């Protein structure tokens, strides 16, 4: 797969990045190099390799699913500048 100049401009537009015409050829080369590397990865033989989330074996840390006392509303809003009935009061932003 190859990226042309029009595709570079479109990607820049979608990403809301200002790209000058002088930068397009350089970015085109960079994107093509990245795609070539990804294509090389598809040639790697992964037969017999189990799917993994990390290169180092580790167990997911899980906590017990227990109900905690949630009656700490006073502590939650203690540092808020303005509250009412355990709710944060904020300035109105939509008219």
Curated annotation (Swiss-Prot):
Keywords in alphabetical order: ATP-binding, Ligase, Nucleotide-binding, Protein biosynthesis
Molecular function terms, GO-annotated: asparaginyl-tRNA synthase (glutamine-hydrolyzing) activity; ATP binding; glutaminyl-tRNA synthase (glutamine-hydrolyzing) activity
EC number: 6.3.5.-
Enzyme class at the top of the EC tree: ligase
Keyword Nucleotide-binding: yes
Catalytic activity from the UniProt record: L-glutamyl-tRNA(Gln) + L-glutamine + ATP + H2O = L-glutaminyl-tRNA(Gln) + L-glutamate + ADP + phosphate + H(+); L-aspartyl-tRNA(Asn) + L-glutamine + ATP + H2O = L-asparaginyl-tRNA(Asn) + L-glutamate + ADP + phosphate + 2 H(+)
HAMAP family given in the database record: GatC
Protein name, per record: Aspartyl/glutamyl-tRNA(Asn/Gln) amidotransferase subunit C
Source lineage: Bacteria, Pseudomonadati, Pseudomonadota, Alphaproteobacteria, Hyphomicrobiales
């Amino acid at each position: 797969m190859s990226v042309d100049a029009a595709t570079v401009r479109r990607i820049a537009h979608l990403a809301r990045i200002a790209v000058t015409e002088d930068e397009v050829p350089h970015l085109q080369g960079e994107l093509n190099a990245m795609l070539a590397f990804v294509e090389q990865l598809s040639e790697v033989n992964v037969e017999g390799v189990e799917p993994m989330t990390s290169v180092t074996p580790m167990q997911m840390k899980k906590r017990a699913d227990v109900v905690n006392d949630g009656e700490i509303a006073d502590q939650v809003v203690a540092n808020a500048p303005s509250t009412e009935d355990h709710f944060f009061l904020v300035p109105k932003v939509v008219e």
